Each structure stands twice: as structure tokens, then as C-alpha cells.
Amino acid sequence: MMETMPNWLMQRAFLTPDRTAIEMEEEKVTFMQLHEKVVSVCEHLTHVGVKRGQKVAVLMKNGMEMITVIHALSYVGAVAVLLNTRLSREELLWQMDDAEVICLVTDQDFEAKDIPVYSFAEVMNGPKEEASIQEEFSLKEAMTIIYTSGTTGKPKGVILTYGNHWASAVGSSFNLGLRDDDCWLACMPMFHVGGLSLLMKNIMYGMRILLVPKYDADFIHKALQTRGVTIISVVSKMLTDLLERLGEETYPPSLRCMLLGGGPAPKPLLEACVEKRIPVYQTYGMTETSSQICTLSADYMLMKVGSAGKPLFQCQLRIEKDGVVVPPFAEGEIVVKGPNVTGGYFNREDATRETIQNGWLHTGDLGYLDEEGFLYVLDRRSDLIISGGENIYPAQIEEVLLSHPMVAEAGVVGMTDDKWGQVPAAFVVKSGEITEEEILHFCEEKLAKYKVPKKAWFLEELPRNASKKLLRRELRQLVEEM
């Protein structure tokens, strides 16, 4: 098994120098131009003291600057600690302290007492110094640290190596196939692994990326119609927004894949996509698996509604309960293994030991396999509602709520109940006139009695993170305040 590889972007710039690497609304950059920009950033970062093996925090929004910084850190051999721009100052300071970073590179106003903060513009306007550029990458070396959302307790820094990122891109290419004319529309934040993984695929495949700095449904919809996009990564909310804009039209046949992540998609949404001939590939993955680890191809979209598919070619997956592998249709914890799976968390030996056992990663997600080995993700274990001893999966109730024509968005969490321990409570964004009573009655017709929400509240919008995933922990806080 190989232990080193040529520096990815340098190799790509050597192989296909004039091919378009990144396209933005008004700008195009070839792989050679990207390499030259990265070398320049590298020399500026070297001047401010960034060296091989150090950890550097990156707090930036999607854009050419962020892309060049991420690559420049790999050129120097430093580890990029990617920070979520939507976090509070306290949360960011905590993560930087936890990751033991030597400095922060940012395009935002940010002050920190104990860590040097370098604005990207200042660094680039400052002096340069000859950089010691890594012409080879060791696949065992850490490339990035990304903090998990921390649905329970403090977030943990997931260490992803060059080997993890390489395996993820290879697995994805086996799964989706590669074409010379591929163009992946990138609108996911690059501080999330889903967005970051596109940067890796971009240079490894030699594939054009259409970069959208921030989520803009109108621009994305238009780009899918006119910019030759073949693949886009989405979550359910984005897919719903795009379908609304599509109306009676269809997207060009060149759009060959919508990669849907971020949790199970409601059935009515998938049915609408089939009607519009939109090829949706449902996926399952997490920071710890360097993006997707399971995918359901569009061939099975309706035959296996709600399934996240089968593992990527070099990955394995099983369902365990109390440490024992369970038969088909038995519910348990999803456990995965593969070369794209992290070796552990930074400075968290206990959490690493608890999560990774004999090379198998215990995801904390609940699911089951059908008789053909297709995975069905039920929910995060931490989101499970246990009511009078019965397991209730919020995703199932949300799917029912979303099938109502007057419901635009839905989120379900557990609410403390004296009799049952917990009961479901729903939060709804309306798309038309509907009352709480009508919503609860609608659920009564479609769900077992114990699964019917005890209460439904209306919100203008649901709390979501930067990649548009529903933040149930914030809904739980709202329940406590109600």
C-alpha cells in the first residue's frame, strides 16, 4: 500500500495546467493559476511564521481566498483547523484553544487575546518569504481538523489525514463515476466536511467546480439550468427550495446527480423529484467518515425510498446492539469501517477509544439493514424519543408532517411528560393556513397514538446550521422555554 503521494494540486497543475479548476459568477481560474495563487499565499504565511506540523485555525467564508489558504497550509505541511463561521466568539475561542492552534487566519473581524489573528488581506499585503513546499504528502499525516457539531457535550476535533481524504474521493468516484465534462456546484460551506471534500475531488479528478460563496437558491437554480452543472450536493431544505423554483420545468439532462445528505428525506419530496426526472442519490456520512460512506443510487430512488443505500466500494457497514451484530430489519447502532474513517479525535483518547473499536467506528446513529443490505437511518441516538418504553424516531413524524400541503418545514423533539417520560412535540413552518388542531388531527390519521405530537408550535423558520441541517438541540431549548 502506498504511503506517500505527490502534492495533489501541484500534480494536477502539472497534468492539466490549462483546465478550469474554479469558476465563480464572474471569474475562472485554471489549475496552474490556482497553484500559483497557492504558492503566493504559502510564501506570505511562511513570513508570519507558519511551519510544518503546526495547527492553524481558518475562519473564512466560501471563496477563492479560503480555497488558497486550505491548499497553502497543505503545501507548508501545517494542519488546517476549519472553523464554522456561524459559531459564537466563545465557541470559536474554545475550539482554537482545544486544537492548540498557533494562529488564526480569517476574513472576518475577530479579536483574541492569546492567539495571533491574521486578516487574510493583511497577510497578503505583507512581505513574502521563501516557503519550504511539501512536494509529497504522507497519507498517514493529519491534513485537517474539523469539529463535530457536538449534539451532546463539547464538540470534538475530528482528525482527517491525507489518506482519509484520498480514500473518500476514490470511493466517491467508484460510486458516481467520472466524466471529463463534470462540473460540481459547490454551495456547502467548506468548513464542513461535505464542502471540503469537493476541494479534494476538484484537484484529484481535475474537475471544474462552480463555487457559490453563500447559499442563494435563485442563483443555484439558474446555474443548474445554464452553467453546465452535472453534480450538486444538497440537503432536503435546498432540494425543496429548488423544486419550488422549478415549477413546471425540468433541469437539463446534463445534471446527472443530486447528492442528498444531511438526514433522511421525506417521501413526498423524493416522489416530486422522480416526477421531475431529477436523479437524487441519497447519502449517509459524517465528519468522521470524511463525507459520504453510503449512497443510494438514483436507480433505487423509489424502490428503496428512505434508504441511504449501500457502503462505498472500500467501506463496510453493520448494525450492532449491545456489541452484537443483529439480523436484517433489527434496529441498532450503525457501525462503519473503511480507509476514509478517522483514526480518532484530537486530544480525546477516551472518546476515541469509546467510538472506534477494532477499526470500527460507532456512529451513535440508529438504523437497520433490509434483507438486501440497504441501510435505513432512523435517527441520531441522541434525538431518539423514548415514550413509555417505546422508541419514537423524530424523522418519521417529520416525514408525516411534511406530507401535509400546508407544512413547509417540520422539526420534532422530545418533551418531558410526567406520565410517559417523554412525548413528541412538533415545530412547524406553515406554507398556508393551518391550525395546531388540524396538524395534530392529520398526525392522528397517519401515526400510532403514542407517536402523535402532544403539541405543535409555529415558527417563521426552523433553526439550522450552516449546511442547512436541522438543529434539534435548539428546538429542545425552545420546548423548555415554552
UniProtKB/Swiss-Prot annotation:
One term of GO molecular function: o-succinylbenzoate-CoA ligase activity
Keyword Lipid biosynthesis: no
Key word Ribosomal protein present: no
InterPro entries linked: AMP-bd_C (IPR025110), AMP-bd_C_sf (IPR045851), AMP-binding_CS (IPR020845), AMP-dep_synth/lig_dom (IPR000873), ANL_N_sf (IPR042099), MenE (IPR010192)
UniProt keyword terms in alphabetical order: ATP-binding, Ligase, Menaquinone biosynthesis, Nucleotide-binding
Catalytic activity: 2-succinylbenzoate + ATP + CoA = 2-succinylbenzoyl-CoA + AMP + diphosphate
Record pathway: Quinol/quinone metabolism; 1,4-dihydroxy-2-naphthoate biosynthesis; 1,4-dihydroxy-2-naphthoate from chorismate: step 5/7; Quinol/quinone metabolism; menaquinone biosynthesis
The family this protein is said to belong to: Belongs to the ATP-dependent AMP-binding enzyme family. MenE subfamily.
Described function: Converts 2-succinylbenzoate (OSB) to 2-succinylbenzoyl-CoA (OSB-CoA).
The name this protein goes by in its record: 2-succinylbenzoate--CoA ligase
Phylogenetic classification of the source organism: Bacteria, Bacillati, Bacillota, Bacilli, Bacillales
Gene it is expressed from: menE
